């Protein structure tokens, strides 16, 4: 089982209290706020912080926060709806591969500079590593995704028993789910670097999974716990 350093060690040497850092990171990824909005909101609490400092916290802490939350993840279903959508990074379109199960639970995501067979394979490998092997995959009309699945079945990366189908109607579920993520991205006013975009989107996906009830929060204080209490409990070693 993966071990984690005490939470105090994560914030050693920081000039700000860890509760402020956790609050800023969780709010930034959970709500339709820009970093400048957060500066004003935190300022109302008598704390002066710059928007660049908040963005630095997001990039520094989100990967570790996501790993710690993962300990409490509920299993996703085996019937996946897979699709990709476009977002802009430094003025260029990049591709966000995502999948949800038939209940709308987020399976995984993968940000790629290209929309091709290799990108689709990378997404599926990541999704299976982080969750489970699917029993069924519903795709859109993307030829690259269909080819990726065929080739992975031929090489044994995907079991031959995995059913594959193409249905725009069934994939409406994941397309609607894209909107929630993209609505959260919009106030951020664009990404300048690909790596920063990937980290930030991982935080947005984490926040969406929390909202969908994809974590065993009973171990973290239950339904009566506040968002701040849930985050503190989940991040504790």
Residue ranges, per PLM feature:
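Residue-level recognition of single "structural anchor" positions
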Residues: 1-237
């Amino acid at each position: 089982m993966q071990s984690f350093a005490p939470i105090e060690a994560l914030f050693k040497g920081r000039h700000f209290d860890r509760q402020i850092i956790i609050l800023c990171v969780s709010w930034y990824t959970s709500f339709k706020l820009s970093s400048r909005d957060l500066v004003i909101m935190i300022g109302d609490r008598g704390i002066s912080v710059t928007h660049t400092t908040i963005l630095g916290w997001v990039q520094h802490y989100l990967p570790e926060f996501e790993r710690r939350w993962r300990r409490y993840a509920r299993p996703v279903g085996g019937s996946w709806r897979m699709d990709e959508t476009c977002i802009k990074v430094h003025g260029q379109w990049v591709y966000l591969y995502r999948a949800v199960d038939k209940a709308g639970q987020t399976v995984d995501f993968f940000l790629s500079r290209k929309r091709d067979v290799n990108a689709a394979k990378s997404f599926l490998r990541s999704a299976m590593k982080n969750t489970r092997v699917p029993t069924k995959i519903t795709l859109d009309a993307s030829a690259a995704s269909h080819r990726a699945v065929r080739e992975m079945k031929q090489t044994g990366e995907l079991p031959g028993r995995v059913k594959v189908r193409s249905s725009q109607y069934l994939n409406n579920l994941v397309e609607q789910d894209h909107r929630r993520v993209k609505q959260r991205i919009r106030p951020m006013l664009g990404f300048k670097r690909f790596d920063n975009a990937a980290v930030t989107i991982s935080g947005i996906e984490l926040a969406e999974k929390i909202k969908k009830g994809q974590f065993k929060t009973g171990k973290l204080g239950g339904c009566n716990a506040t968002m701040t209490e849930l985050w503190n409990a989940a991040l504790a070693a």
